[in-house]
Every structure is written in C-alpha cells, then in structure tokens.
C-alpha cells in the first residue's frame, strides 16, 4: 500500500489534504470559457489560456475521467462555461446538443450530474439522404451570450421546419418569446441543413445553411435574427438567380475580423461574381452585403466535379489574411484587404497528396514559441503542420502524422498556455483521439478510444479537461494521476485512475476505505480534520 506522496513524488502531500474543511488544490487555469465554435471569432481552434495540460503531463498522466450518456449523435461542438451559478451552487458546466434535439447542461467536472435537459421536438428523419442519419436535429454548434445568459441554437423538426431557440443557460427555459420558425423568401427548410456553427455579432444571431446530399432546389443562405427578440433582420441567398452555393463549411462557423466583417466559404453552384457567389471565399458586411471575395481560377471545373471549395470555413490569421481549403486539397490564402476576386488568392498550393470527393477541414492556427503554425486535417490524408511566415505559408510541411483518416475526417483543436505548451488534439475516423506535441509535431503524446466517433466533430479543451461528443456519449478526459478539484466550490470532486481505493483518516484513527468506486468521487468538507490517500 502506498500513499499519495509515494504515488506522485513531485506532488506535495498537502495538496491532497482536506483539513478543517479547507482544500489544498492545484493551481487553476485563468478564466476560460468556450462559448462558440472553434473558440474565437477568428476560428483559430486554439485555446491559448490552458495552464494545466502540457505536453509533458499529457504524455504521462492523461486518460478518460468519465462519460455521460446522451440520446443521440453529437455533431455540435460541446460548449463550456465556468463558475456558473446553477443547481444551487457555482459550477463548471458543459452544454451538449444532440441530433435527437436534446440539449443537456452537465456538470463539467463530475459524472452524471445533469443540471437540466430539454427536448426541443421530434427530429427530422431523412428518407433519401444518408449523409446524416438516422435523424437530423441540432447539427450546428450553438453560441452562448454570457452577458444575457443565453444559448442560441437551430433545431430541425420532423415536419422539416427549423426553429431558432434562445435558452436560459441556468434553466434551459425558452427566452425572448422563442422559439421562432426560421424562414425567408424562397427558403425551403426541409431541404436545407443548418450545419455551420452559429455566429453572435453585434446583437445579431447568424445561421448558415447548405443542403441534404445536394438534393432539391437548394441555395446557400445566411439569416440574421435579433438576439433580444428573435425578430428576423437580415437575409442573404448566395445564388438568388441560380442554384446551390451551400454554406456548410464542415461545421465551421463564420469568421469575423476586427471591423465586424463576416467571412464564409461556399460550395458548388452558380457563380457570376455579381449576384451569384458559389465556390468563393466571401467577405460580407454585418448586414450581409458582399464587400469582396476570392475564388479559384478553376472554379467551374471544380464545381462540375463536386469539388466544393467551401467544404471547410475560413480562418483569420494576423495581420490581415484568411486561409481555407476545399475538397481539391489546395490551401488558399487571401488578403482580406484586397481579396482579388477570381484568381485573387495571394497563395494557393496543393497541401495534400490525395484529393477527390473528400472533405477538407479548416486549419488550426497557433502562434508558437518561435513561429506561427498551421495544422491541417483533410480526409484521406494525414494531418500536417506548416509554418506561416506572416505573409505566406511555407509549402514544405514541418511534420506529417502517421495516421491517415478515411473520407470522413474528424476535427482538430489546440490547447496552449499562450505561446507555450501547445498540444494538438485530433479526433480520428478510427474513433481514437490523438494528442500531439504541437511544436514537435507529429510526436504523439497520447492515443485513446473515444467510443463511436462522429465525423467532423471537434474536441473542446478547457481548464485541464478535454470534452468530446460521440454517437451517444459526451466523454471527459484529463490528468489521472492526482486528485484534482476545481477551487471555489462547496464540494470537492476528486478524480483518480481506476484500480485504487480512496481511504480516509483523522489525526487519531486508522485508515478506513472511503469508497471502492472509480472516480470521480464527491467529498463534502466537514469541520473535522480529515485526510485522504489512495491505496493500490
């Protein structure tokens, strides 16, 4: 039998004591909330406020902490709010949406604690499209407005109609008179798929739409709704006198620059550069007027070959660039101050070896310790890292992963403490999550099964934990070789790896087994002198 001091020679035993009701805990991360798809309005995919997870401890002490069951597939990225006043206390909360039209508010640190769960109607059952089955409900990642305590989402119903909901993040109750039916001129909701993450900008919630399996007379749409009363305020059709032009973006939400301009990419369809804007990277005003665009010179042949340029969304990188990739594997860099129209990219090169009817996910961008990094995932190709020089991408990869996904690629996210301790997180089509050393890519730090993966899903990293949605669960991973608790809560939730016993004692008595259950375990502080240790 070993005590915790022997288990973790680097840990001070006082960290594990609960003495006179006071917990000695590890230092906490600075405030980090993940309230939108891919972390920020630039859609970098990087959480640069992660102070707990590092390449060193992920490589040695990382694993699954717990899993909560949900009632459907989780295509939307989980969102995270820390220190939320909910359930009679202050807690960290993860928000999870499913294709069954369920929304869950789970405790982000403890297994099985559901603060609320709402079902927003019977989901849609596609009959002729197998791209997303068996049902379609909440697909696009919601967005949270912390100032109003509101979560916005789109849900598709069995009738084919779609509704915009505004939910109170502490109760799940509808707000602002919602839900409202999503509609506009020419909009046939039954054939439109709300795939990209939602955007909240200047009191407007934006929703983007593509198609189900390219079926029917669909268009690409972006619709804007007032965030305080859910009234429609803006509507834009990508191909008003043509067809198609989906805004689906592999789930990526629109990007936004510092001037409030919106950036999206569009798929196959009609293009003329005046009214119809398929196969483009677009710069739009907040009122959804076209300000500028870039398009590949071979847009027509790409469109005819179902090589959607907009299979991913744009990522904004300093000082004034947007970057994206489509099915043809060409990585395209645009100057957002002068996008150049057809052939106007400042750089375009083939970043992968295998193209075809595949999906290119948006890059992840990170300013590392000595250079700027881009990480690129594309279906049927291994993930790669590239250097961004400040004005162009070095076309020779810095590193190439050994794992090659199928034609339905997972997503990438990155955690770092500013420019240090970068870890790249990848969800693979083999239902494994991989953690890479971002600076020394493709050095693999950790690999483990997540369950049954969902295509294009992105992990969420916040305050020492990684949250991943699957076909029927939300899984939580983190450091496993110490008892870890969030500060500032009345009860302590302790996590440890399986196969150990939690034992307690006071200053006078023997060690007594407190629980044989696997972690996490909730400890209620008392006024007695109580000490905890793990035994083997």
What does each model-identified segment do?
Residues 273, 390-394:
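Subtilisin-like serine protease catalytic core
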Residues 480-536:
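Short, composition-biased motifs enriched in small/polar/acidic residues
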């Amino acid at each position: 039998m070993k005590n915790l001091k022997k288990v973790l020679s680097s840990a001070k035993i006082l960290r594990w004591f609960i003495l006179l009701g006071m917990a000695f805990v590890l230092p906490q991360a600075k405030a980090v909330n993940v309230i939108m798809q891919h972390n920020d309005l630039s859609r970098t995919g990087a959480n640069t406020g992660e102070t707990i997870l590092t390449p060193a401890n992920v490589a040695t002490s990382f694993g699954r902490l717990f899993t909560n069951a949900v009632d459907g597939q989780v295509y939307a990225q989980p969102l995270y709010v820390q220190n939320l006043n909910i359930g009679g206390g202050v807690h960290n909360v993860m928000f999870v949406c499913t294709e069954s039209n369920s929304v869950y508010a789970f405790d982000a640190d403890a297994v099985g604690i559901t603060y609320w769960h709402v079902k927003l109607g019977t989901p849609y059952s596609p009959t002729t499209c197998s791209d997303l089955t068996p049902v379609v409900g909440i697909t696009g990642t919601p967005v949270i407005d912390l100032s109003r305590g509101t979560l916005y989402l789109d849900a598709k119903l069995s009738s084919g109609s779609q509704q915009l909901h505004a939910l109170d993040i502490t109760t799940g109750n509808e707000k602002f008179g919602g839900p409202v039916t999503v509609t506009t001129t020419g909009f046939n909701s039954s054939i439109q798929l709300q795939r990209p993450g939602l955007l909240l900008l200047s009191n407007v919630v934006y929703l983007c739409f593509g198609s189900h399996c390219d079926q029917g007379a669909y268009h690409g749409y972006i619709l804007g709704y007032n965030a305080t009363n859910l009234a429609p305020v803006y509507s834009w059709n990508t191909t008003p006198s043509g067809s198609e032009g989906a805004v689906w973006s592999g789930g990526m939400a629109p990007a936004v620059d510092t001037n409030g301009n919106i950036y999206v990419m569009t798929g196959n369809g009609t293009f003329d550069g005046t009214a119809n804007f398929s196969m483009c990277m677009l710069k739009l005003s907040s009122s959804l007027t076209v300000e500028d665009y870039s398009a590949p010179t071979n847009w027509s042949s790409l469109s005819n070959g179902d090589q959607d340029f907009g299979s991913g969304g744009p990522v904004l990188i300093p000082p004034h660039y947007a970057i994206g990739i489509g099915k043809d594997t060409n990585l395209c860099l645009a100057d957002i101050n002068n996008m150049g129209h057809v052939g106007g990219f400042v750089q375009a090169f083939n970043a992968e070896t295998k193209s075809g009817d595949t999906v290119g996910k948006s890059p992840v961008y990170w300013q590392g310790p000595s250079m700027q990094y881009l990480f690129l995932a594309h279906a049927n190709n291994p993930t790669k890292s590239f250097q961004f020089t400040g004005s162009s991408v070095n076309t020779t990869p810095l590193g190439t992963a050994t794992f090659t996904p199928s034609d339905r690629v997972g997503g990438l996210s990155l955690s770092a403490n500013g420019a240090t301790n970068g870890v790249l997180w990848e969800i693979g089509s083999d239902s494994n999550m991989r953690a890479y050393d971002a600076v020394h890519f493709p050095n693999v730090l950790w690999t483990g099964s997540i369950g049954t993966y969902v295509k294009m899903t992105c992990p969420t990293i916040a305050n020492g934990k990684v949250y991943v949605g699957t076909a029927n669960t939300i899984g939580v991973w983190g450091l496993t070789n110490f008892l870890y608790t969030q500060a500032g809560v009345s009860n302590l939730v302790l996590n440890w790896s399986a196969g150990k016993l939690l034992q307690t004692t006071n200053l006078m008595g023997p060690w007594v087994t407190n629980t044989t259950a696997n972690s996490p375990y909730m400890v209620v502080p008392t006024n007695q002198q109580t000490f905890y240790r793990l035994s083997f």
